[in-house]
Amino acid sequence: DFLKATTKSLLDSDLKDNQYISAKGKRVVIIGGGDTGNDCVGTSIRHGAASVTQLEMMPKAPDTRAENNPWPEWPKVCKTDYGQEEAIAVFGHDPRIYQTTVKEFLKDKNGNLCGLVTVKLESKKDEKTGRMMMAEVPGSEQKMDADLVLIAAGFLGTENYIANAFGVDLN
């Protein structure tokens, strides 16, 4: 809703219709480290956010390719995209906090969002499945101020209606 409404308002009225969620003057926290999260970082900065923090549950990727990740495989490296670059230019630091998730949203006496409680995460092996998973680090909870929280996580993929309309088989 945040990105779509901002784009529609920008195209329809150069943001003069106020038909979007404004980040102006707000302490913005974005949950999600992917492309949509990056777009939320950049858009929040252009709105005039007081601060922008981006939470990523996974560890920071390495700065250079590992030997087991050769070309032409997709590079599994840390990517600093335009939104993070804008945050560095405006606020003087990378907005990302890695291996962190939200445990609780905090509200003031009027019921308005005023912050959240985060917790650090670490990789652990699930004893039942043998798979690696992220688990909370006990005692690592921290409070963070926030006036606006944007959830930018869980991309499910594209819609199939165009492929279906043309009889294209997907795999």
Per-region residue spans from a language model:
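Residues forming the flavin
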Residues: D1-N171
